[in-house]
Amino acid sequence: MSSSRTIIRGGLVITASDELHADILIEDGRVAALAAAGTSAAEAWTAERTIDATGKYVIPGGVDAHTHMELPFGGTFASDTFETGTRAAAWGGTTTIVDFAVQSVGHTLREGLDAWHAKAEGNCAIDYGFHMIVSDVHQETLKEMDLLVQEGVTSFKQFMAYPGVFYSDDGQILRAMQRSADNGGLIMMHAENGIAIDVLVEQALARGETDPRYHGEVRKALLEAEATHRAIKLAQVAGAPLYVVHVSAMEAVAELARARDEGLPVFGETCPQYLFLSTDNLAEPDFEGSKYVCSTPLRPREHQAKLWQGLRTDDLQVVSTDHCPFCFVGQKELGRGDFSKIPNGLPGVENRMDLLHQAVVDGHISRRRWIEIACANPARMFGMYPKKGTIAPGADADIVIYDPNAVQVVSADTHHMNVDYSAYEGKHVTGRVETVLSRGELVITEREYTGHAGHGTYTPRSTCQYLN
């Protein structure tokens, strides 16, 4: 039926592997064909809707493989719901998120997963999948991991941090890694030595060091590196692949690089906050620094160059946001007088694609690498490629028309995330999302929201495609 056909004409199509001036035919929510602009094949297409992308980039929708909508943390909840968070993601050119369902201690994986399905179903503007946070490893949990992999939840997050909440000890981590080595799942690790960090927190507070900047000082880069090294060795013993989340320290990048040089299936993710922000932000006066409290913490500025280098050399493969927003008023303020009570997390799901385009403008990465780390690699890593993460016949028509020349100023006044501040307030960025399609449906139309809650569907995933 012609009513479900769309043509995008005249744009520069950029994927992880190619840049070409091509027209795109979309049919029934999928990419049906690409043809060089101006050719007879492209000219022969007809459709009800034609989008003019002349002078623009045509890129795959972003895949943000690390978000926390409605996450309970520190006595409060992340301020974005699945409805507000996925709408904001669409505004930022992201068309798929993978969020984290949480197993609470004493409960089953299934109970946690069901709870997250209930939060998301019917509320999302874009497609979504789930990872599973495993906080209580025992024989029943391990059996459940096999079942979850079979139904498309193919990655499991463990924490070496947060004793008493999400923490797993080395024995629990090893057991889960052994299980994932057998069932094809991928262990995602929050690599920080939480036991040692808790000692440093206690000592800092006893000295009266209560301001937000001490959050960064106690969560030492060496303790991120140590935990990264330990996670790599445990994975090696288990014969399992490993994905280290939110890498922030150059010493941790060095551990990943060493493991990869040895040929181990070890992967790393970093986030825009570590590439663009630093401990200078944590030290902002009048408790403003609390806006930048996240874990792993922001590092001194000299770490940024090593993170960019890791992205260029493929020692880091993915940039996700770890989007976990808490309002300054009433939420971040819970930690006034005690930095350890500041809810950990930053808003960013709307900013990632633009910040990484700015990195292209600044010469840190190429255009294709931008698409690779923001779209293709996360889709491959988490079993969604080539349905997601690229523009090719058969792929979902998750497509962004991107204006590479528009200049914008990032601000809480104009963003769509449900949070009262921007981590990048006042930053000038070159490049802006103009139009977004999710499975061929217009979600953002020339800078206007035309999507709706419930369009986004749950996306089961296959196992990590880097290992196949």
Question: Where on the chain are the PLM-derived regions?
Answer:
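His/Asp/Glu-enriched, well-ordered alpha-helical/loop segment
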Residues: T210-G239, T313, Q317-V319, P325-A406
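C-terminal cap of metal-dependent C-N hydrolases
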Residues: G11, E333-D338, P393-T459
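Alpha-helix-loop-beta-strand connector modules within alpha/beta enzyme cores
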Residues: R110-I126, L174-M189
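Short catalytic-loop micro-motif centered on adjacent basic/acidic residues
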Residues: V98-D99, G129-M132, P241-H246
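Histidine-rich, glycine-flanked metal-binding segment
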Residues: M1-P60
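Metal-associated gating/positioning segment near the N- to mid-region
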Residues: A53-N123, E140
